[in-house]
């Protein structure tokens, strides 16, 4: 694929909206803009100034009123000459404007090609490019803050610092291969290597939280029919997503929606009440409920606190034996939050389970009481600790894996040096560590990987 031609794409989401934007980037961006856009006030284009006019077709017929701006490279997103045309947000209008740009000499952009050009032109590195996608797909304010911090360059700066720590020992090892008679202070190799290993280990450890914030987790709501699972789902989502009736068994299939709980995007699965049934549809729903529990990172055992334990509860509780589980005592509004009843229910269910639950929370899906505590408890069990104050977490599994390999190679080099391994073998590990870091920043990646990464972007980004 060429990267020195001019591309165009619709940069706004499909469908109707207030405006639609067509983006053009490449060496002929201004020429194409001048062919299809006629400003009301003629004159030379001044970069970064919005102009009002009309988009016209090849015959001069007006396509739509528009606002257009031209940005001179490298002071643009792609670091190339770029034009953006804003028109009315009807899908037909926006598509017609795009077709005029293509007819005037632009090529239809591939998914993520604008961001790829920003990377290839050195405006951002690969970690920052991937952060752009994370900003678009962020489902919680915490995930958004982490993505914005990565786009701001903290990870790139830290990796360049670590790379520099590895480069000096590599230079010493290379010199010792060529000039073995030279003497090197051991601290000149051991000190930066130790610092690099510690820094890489810290980044890898941060991914345990960061990936959850970015990708989310899964939680299954399980319990008897009419325990209030669907009502609780609706309350956590703050919308009426699941059908709720007083009739037990209303939910006969699993239903999934994503909620932000304690800053963590959690896919909540509302399951059918687990009971013995001769109804084939209900039995299928129960089977899917069991599957949902198996796939979940966490289970919420939803209990109607006003009712005593029943025989059906034993089978339900058994599903939680190998799963982190929150005993969620619902409908506390029916018992006026009577502590003696709450304690009795907790004791009864723990006796059935044979051990304590990972947490117990009292809630009322009807009044909203306890929902914030439930969300915080879910986040605590998933994360184990609150987010770092500076928000500097590795959030991408690809980055974590590459940095883990870098840490292993750097550690092997450090251990090898302490054990007197020859400099040429140390250089192999140091080079491998530096290359693994380059897989994150983009300094040592192939074209296939780049296409795999950028193909996940939408067209126009």
Swiss-Prot record:
**Keyword terms of this UniProt record:** Cytoplasm, GTP-binding, Hydrolase, Magnesium, Metal-binding, Nucleotide-binding, Potassium, tRNA processing
PROSITE patterns for this protein: G_TRME
Physiological role? Exhibits a very high intrinsic GTPase hydrolysis rate. Involved in the addition of a carboxymethylaminomethyl (cmnm) group at the wobble position (U34) of certain tRNAs, forming tRNA-cmnm(5)s(2)U34.
Question: Which cofactor does this sequence's record say it needs?
Answer: K(+)
Q: Which family does it belong to?
A: Belongs to the TRAFAC class TrmE-Era-EngA-EngB-Septin-like GTPase superfamily. TrmE GTPase family.
Assigned EC number: 3.6.-.-
Give the TrmE-type G domain ranges: 216-383
Cite the record's note on assembly: Homodimer. Heterotetramer of two MnmE and two MnmG subunits.
GO terms for CC?
Answer: cytosol
Localization (cell): Cytoplasm
- Binding-site residues for (6S)-5-formyl-5,6,7,8-tetrahydrofolate, renumbered to this chain: 23, 84, 123, 461
Q: Could you tell me what this protein is called?
A: tRNA modification GTPase MnmE
Binding residues for Mg(2+): 230, 251
Q: Where does K(+) bind?
A: 226, 245, 247, 250
In the record, which residues are listed under signal peptide? none
User: What NCBIfam families is this protein classified in?
Assistant: mnmE_trmE_thdF, small_GTP
**Which of the seven top EC classes does this enzyme belong to?**
hydrolase
